[in-house]
From Swiss-Prot:
PTM characteristics: Isoform M is N-terminally acetylated by host at a ratio of 90%, and N-glycosylated by host at the pre-S2 region.
Localization of this protein: Virion membrane
InterPro entries recorded: HBV_HBSAG
Protein name: Large envelope protein
Disordered: annotated segments: 115-147
Annotated lipid attachment (N-myristoyl glycine): 2
A GO cellular component annotation in the UniProt record: membrane
Positions on the Intravirion side per record topology: 2-286, 236-286, 401-406
Chain segments annotated as transmembrane: 215-235, 287-307, 380-400, 407-429
Pre-S1: annotated span: 2-148
């Protein structure tokens, strides 16, 4: 396993950081100070020094004959350059040599059971070196719940992170130089790889687009669409039965369109199976019924908007006219969005002839005037329509008689239309 040495240069001493021991200032002054240059070196041919004397011997004797331009003679695998290669300032005069030893505790990280590379496990003393010691009464217990003791390891983890932060730099040169006397080893992992949080598995989190409220709204929308689709099919089937019953006052006969290849049972012409010849005609009738229903809805919407005065149409024959200056008559009915509307003409004399648009039934008056201009015989119906409008009691009696006559047949087809009638009534009231 490779070891990292951080070497810094100053006029008096050489400082090095060794993972297993700590930071040293050499007590021996180098003879050739230009040999030692700043950098972080990774080597595999050296063992960890046990004390400062071994480190001085390694730094002074082993590295002073290295050609730093070509890196010849240095047992190094990779070199990570520092941010600044300028020598640090001269230390204080009263600075003394420091020798200390770091005793790292066990680093317990959830999901990572191995010892991180770059750290050397503490050596267990043997009986040969330190003499025989009494056997402890109870062996140390193995930590089986690392997540419960994570708070107690904060100090050791912080020391390990600080040490590796000194080794890492902003710029790395991935140039490996092979040494014939050493064996290459992979680089020491950085803090991000050693102390990376363990990956957790579980239920995937819902994205903001698929929150529970939006999912509920989607399901409710699908239910409403399905309900409306079933009602539309029921309305078409009932209207088809009603239209067919008008052609057969004595009752709807059985369908006679039988297929020679697929014999079908007896059925009504309003519920033909796909194997029957009348199946296509049945769906053609229902398609025409759909078109008529859409046309009725469009007519109802136009009548409602015309009654509210939201369709500004200039009448063909205005009843009242006013003449104003053309400078004041610059806005037409299409450019105004709030009543009252007016229609203006600009003659050559310099004055404008304007007449107001009716506040209600403007489209109806326009269509009636357009029809009277092309069909003159409609003028004969004006007294009749005025008479029917004046005798409201007779009109009510006629309506009651028609409902009494067609009541039983209408009761079977009106229930599917009740939601539509309620919707139209609400639109009529609140618009």
């Amino acid at each position: 396993m490779g070891n990292n040495i951080k070497v810094t240069f100053n006029p008096d001493k050489i400082a090095a950081w060794w993972p297993a021991v700590g930071t040293y200032y050499t007590t021996t002054y180098p003879q050739n100070q230009s040999v030692f240059q700043p950098g972080i070196y990774q080597t595999t041919s050296l063992i960890n020094p046990k004390n400062q004397q071994e480190l001085d011997s390694v730094l002074i004797n082993r590295y002073k004959q290295i050609d730093w331009n070509t890196w010849q003679g240095f047992p190094v695998d990779q070199k990570f350059s520092l941010v600044s290669r300028d020598p640090p300032p001269k230390p204080y005069i009263n600075q003394s040599a420091q020798t200390f030893e770091i005793k790292p505790g066990p680093i317990i990280v959830p999901g990572i059971r191995d010892i991180p590379r770059g750290l050397v496990p503490p050596q267990t003393p043997t009986n040969r070196d330190q003499g025989r010691k009494p056997t402890p009464p109870t062996p140390p217990l193995r930590d089986t719940h690392p997540h419960l003791t994570m708070k107690n390891q904060t100090f050791h983890l912080q020391g390990f992170v600080d040490g590796l932060r000194d080794l890492t730099t902003t710029e790395r040169q991935h140039n490996a130089y092979r040494d014939p006397f050493t064996t290459l080893s992979p680089a020491v992992p950085t803090v991000s790889t050693i102390l990376s949080p363990p990956s957790t598995t579980g239920d995937p989190a819902l994205s903001p687009e698929m929150s529970p409220s939006s999912l509920l709204g989607l399901l409710a929308g699908l239910q409403v669409v399905y309900f409306l689709w079933t009602k539309i099919l029921t309305i078409a089937q009932n209207l088809d039965w009603w239209c067919t019953s008008l052609s057969f006052p004595g009752g709807i006969p059985e369908c006679t369109g039988q297929n020679s290849q697929f014999q079908t049972c007896k059925h009504l012409p309003t519920s033909c199976p796909p194997t029957c010849n009348g199946f296509r005609w049945m769906y053609l009738r229902r398609f025409i019924i759909y078109l008529l229903v859409l046309l009725l809805c469009l007519i109802f919407l136009l009548v409602l908007l015309d009654w509210k005065g939201l369709i500004p149409v200039c009448p063909l024959q205005p009843t009242t006219e006013t003449t104003v200056n053309c400078r004041q008559c610059t806005i037409s009915a299409q450019d105004m969005y709030t009543p009252p509307y007016c229609c203006c003409l600009k003659p050559t004399a310099g004055n404008c002839t304007c007449w107001p648009i009716p506040s209600s039934w403007a489209l109806g008056n326009y269509l009636w005037e357009w029809a009277l201009a092309r069909l003159s015989w409609l003028n004969l119906l004006v007294p009749l329509l005025q008479w029917l409008g004046g005798i409201s009691l007779i009109a009510w009696f006629l309506l009651i008689w028609m409902i009494w006559f067609w009541g039983p047949a209408l009761l079977s087809i009106l229930p599917p239309f009740i939601p539509i009638f309620v919707l139209f009534f609400l639109i009529w009231v609140y618009i």
